[in-house]
């Protein structure tokens, strides 16, 4: 069972202090026991749930709202400025009214019974008050200890937090210094790389004319090489010169009859006409040589044979010349 003891003043006796005790099982709306005492006498009454419902119907209010108003007046301990209590010792009638700005209305009324042994009621009331005070004091002490513990924890946390803040600031300062050092190193490295890049670009600019000069010289040499004769052309020219020289040396001899031009003319004529075989001039030449050999003396015959052998070698050289090859 729950209890609530409050101190009130009656409207008829404002200088006298009364103590009002209300106890209930579940809620105030389910019924309660009211006890009133002035320290000498005591009055009590039991209010049922049906009576509360009847009072709510008489006031045209809902039961829950009416029970809430009773709880505020009897249990919450509101001051006399909001609620007014009226009690008559002769009739033992107890009523309470709620005061508004300009009006007041009756919230409830109960018929109390005087307790024959008021001392027991007062003793129970005092014991309850003392127990409540002890309980509240123990709870207060427990809360105070808890508050002290929380305060110590808070101080400890605050100290750790301050240390963490100091360490954080020191770490930030150290990291900032390291960042500045790394940044300066990077800037220095970037400057050196830019400087090296500029030097390389300047060197490339300086080497570019030399490269162009070398390229132009190389192109000139290649043009000169392309303008020169090939190995085959050079060999052919050398052979032609040798053949010409040998022909000149042979042609300049007064003792040898040069029959090569007539033979060559015949050879060209036969090639252009394309009707006679190439071996016919050689046969005619051999016949002419035989007739000439029969008419000459023996000595001239030997000389003629020697000359014929030279002419044959000359013909071989002439046939091996570049002109005969291309013919």
UniProtKB/Swiss-Prot annotation:
Residues 255-327 are annotated as: Disordered. InterPro entries: DNA_repair_prot_XRCC4, XRCC4-like_C, XRCC4-like_N_sf, XRCC4_C, XRCC4_CC, XRCC4_N, XRCC4_N_sf. The record marks 258-259 as: Cleavage. The keyword Nucleus applies. Signal peptide: none annotated. The keyword Disulfide bond does not apply. Residues 133-153, 183-213 form a coiled coil. Residues 1-211 are annotated as: Interaction with IFFO1. A motif (Nuclear localization signal) lies at residues 263-268. The modification Phosphotyrosine is found at residue 226. Phosphorylated by PRKDC at the C-terminus in response to DNA damage; Ser-253 constitutes the main phosphorylation sites. Phosphorylations by PRKDC at the C-terminus of XRCC4 and NHEJ1/XLF are highly redundant and regulate ability of the XRCC4-NHEJ1/XLF subcomplex to bridge DNA. Phosphorylation by PRKDC does not prevent interaction with NHEJ1/XLF but disrupts ability to bridge DNA and promotes detachment from DNA. Phosphorylation at Ser-320 and Ser-321 by PRKDC promotes recognition by the SCF(FBXW7) complex and subsequent ubiquitination via 'Lys-63'-linked ubiquitin. Ubiquitinated at Lys-289 by the SCF(FBXW7) complex via 'Lys-63'-linked ubiquitination, thereby promoting double-strand break repair: the SCF(FBXW7) complex specifically recognizes XRCC4 when phosphorylated at Ser-320 and Ser-321 by PRKDC, and 'Lys-63'-linked ubiquitination facilitates DNA non-homologous end joining (NHEJ) by enhancing association with XRCC5/Ku80 and XRCC6/Ku70. Monoubiquitinated. The modification Phosphoserine is found at residues 53, 192, 229, 249, 253, 294-295, 308, 313, 320-321. Its main location: nucleus. GO terms for cellular component: cytosol; DNA ligase IV complex; DNA-dependent protein kinase-DNA ligase 4 complex; nucleoplasm; nucleus; site of double-strand break. PANTHER family: DNA REPAIR PROTEIN XRCC4 (PTHR28559:SF1). This is DNA repair protein XRCC4. It comes from Cricetulus griseus (Chinese hamster).
């Amino acid at each position: 069972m729950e209890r609530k003891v409050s101190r009130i003043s009656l409207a008829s006796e404002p200088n006298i202090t009364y103590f009002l005790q209300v106890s209930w099982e579940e809620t105030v709306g389910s019924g309660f026991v009211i006890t009133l005492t002035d320290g000498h006498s005591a009055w009590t009454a039991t209010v049922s749930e049906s009576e509360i419902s009847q009072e709510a119907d008489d006031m045209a209010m809902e039961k829950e709202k009416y029970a809430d108003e009773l709880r505020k007046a009897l249990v919450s301990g509101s001051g006399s400025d909001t609620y007014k209590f009226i009690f008559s010792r002769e009739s033992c009638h107890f009523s309470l009214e709620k005061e508004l700005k300009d009006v007041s209305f009756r919230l409830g009324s109960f018929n109390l019974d005087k307790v024959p042994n008021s001392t027991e009621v007062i003793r129970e009331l005092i014991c309850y008050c003392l127990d409540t005070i002890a309980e509240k004091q123990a709870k207060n002490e427990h809360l105070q200890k808890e508050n002290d513990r929380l305060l110590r924890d808070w101080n400890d946390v605050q100290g750790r937090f301050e240390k963490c803040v100091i360490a954080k600031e020191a770490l930030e300062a150290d990291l900032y210094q390291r960042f500045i050092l790394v940044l300066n190193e990077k800037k220095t490295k970037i400057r050196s790389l830019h400087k090296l890049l500029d030097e390389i670009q300047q060197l490339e600019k300086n080497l570019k004319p030399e490269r162009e000069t070398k390229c132009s010289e190389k192109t000139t040499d290649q043009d000169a090489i392309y303008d020169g004769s090939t190995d085959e052309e050079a060999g052919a020219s050398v052979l032609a010169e040798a053949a010409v020289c040998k022909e000149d040396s042979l042609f300049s001899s007064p003792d040898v009859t040069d029959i090569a031009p007539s033979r060559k003319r015949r050879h060209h004529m036969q090639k252009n006409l394309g009707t006679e075989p190439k071996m016919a001039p050689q046969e005619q030449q051999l016949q002419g040589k035989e007739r000439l050999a029969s008419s000459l003396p023996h000595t001239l015959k030997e000389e003629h044979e020697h000359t014929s052998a030279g002419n044959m070698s000359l013909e071989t050289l002439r046939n091996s010349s570049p002109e005969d090859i291309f013919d």
